[in-house]
């Protein structure tokens, strides 16, 4: 019989257990189950309401879910991730048990919107989410392209490009980012503390954070990130965030910034470029397809509004 345990806080010993389970599942699936934001909050929770739920079957950990709140979200909401061992997926009710326990925790903590992310969703994921009261919100596609591209950036007239300077460009970047992503649930609504936390990450490199200026100021940006090679993937160069001020859209600046970011990554010797894009963003998908990107992975978000207990 499946037993669920609430882990609040998640202790170092708990984290060892979760990491071992996640690594075992990733070795079978060929992709992670928990995203970077989950691991970041597991390591350093931003709020004490973060909690893990561990599923135990006959004394063996077979599943784990994590719920947390973060100021990276606009409007503010809960996020959740889940990993379940392939041996018990879909048939034992582990997913539903984890989600129902997570919902109970959110309700006890005041309720709110919960967004669950599942990587490479299958039918049993859709069914489990629906049984736990979640509905499909959106799909996010991971796109990849071989590097180098063989294309140079074609900058609009009067545009100059240089790397981001921490402490100097923060406010200008936040202003353009929040205009460019005004309606985006993760990238919009950033504040200085959000940016500072990203710059404190070990992967942050201002040389790969390109800013494009015109006569009126900051017009757009391309922020890149390097992922070390893993057993499942080669070293990847990610377009972490690409944004153009709404007043400059349609000028060709977006394509030039993508090409410039990928060129920077190729110059570092990285052979594969990567980015994430919403599955219904047809304009962006056409742009990326024209540059040679193809879909490598699909991530799915499910949402549920939870009333306070």
Label every PLM stretch briefly.
Residues 240-243, 249-276, 287-289, 293, ...:
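Hydrophobic multi-pass inner-membrane translocation pores used for secretion
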Residues 1-40, 154-188:
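Short amphipathic alpha-helix that is part of the acyltransferase structural core
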């Amino acid at each position: 019989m499946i037993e669920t345990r609430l882990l609040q806080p998640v202790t170092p010993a708990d984290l060892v257990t979760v990491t071992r389970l996640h690594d075992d599942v990733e070795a079978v699936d060929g992709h992670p189950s928990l995203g970077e934001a989950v691991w970041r909050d597991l390591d350093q929770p931003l709020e004490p309401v973060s909690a893990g739920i561990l599923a135990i079957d006959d004394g063996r950990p077979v599943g784990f879910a994590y719920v947390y709140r973060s100021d990276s979200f606009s409007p503010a909401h809960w996020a959740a991730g889940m990993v379940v061992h392939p041996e018990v997926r879909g048939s034992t009710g582990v997913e539903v048990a984890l989600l129902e326990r997570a919902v109970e925790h959110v309700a006890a903590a005041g309720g709110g919107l919960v967004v669950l992310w599942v990587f490479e969703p299958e039918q049993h994921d859709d069914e489990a989410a629906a049984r736990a009261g979640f509905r499909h919100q959106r799909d996010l596609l991971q796109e990849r392209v071989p590097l180098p591209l063989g294309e140079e950036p074609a900058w609009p007239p009067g545009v100059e490009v240089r790397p981001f300077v921490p402490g100097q460009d923060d406010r200008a970047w936040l202003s353009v980012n929040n205009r460019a992503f005004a309606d985006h649930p993760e990238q919009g609504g950033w504040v200085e503390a959000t940016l500072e936390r990203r710059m404190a990450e070990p992967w942050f490199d201002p040389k790969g954070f390109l800013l494009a200026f015109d006569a009126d100021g900051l017009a757009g940006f391309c922020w890149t990130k390097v992922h070390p090679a893993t057993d499942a993937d080669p070293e990847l160069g990610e377009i972490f965030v690409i944004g153009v001020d709404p007043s400059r859209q349609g000028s060709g600046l977006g394509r030039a910034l993508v090409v410039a970011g990928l060129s920077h990554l190729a110059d570092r010797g990285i052979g594969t470029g990567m980015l994430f894009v919403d599955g219904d963003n047809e304009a962006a998908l056409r742009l990326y397809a024209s540059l040679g990107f193809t879909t490598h992975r699909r991530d799915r978000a499910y949402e549920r509004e939870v009333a306070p207990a």
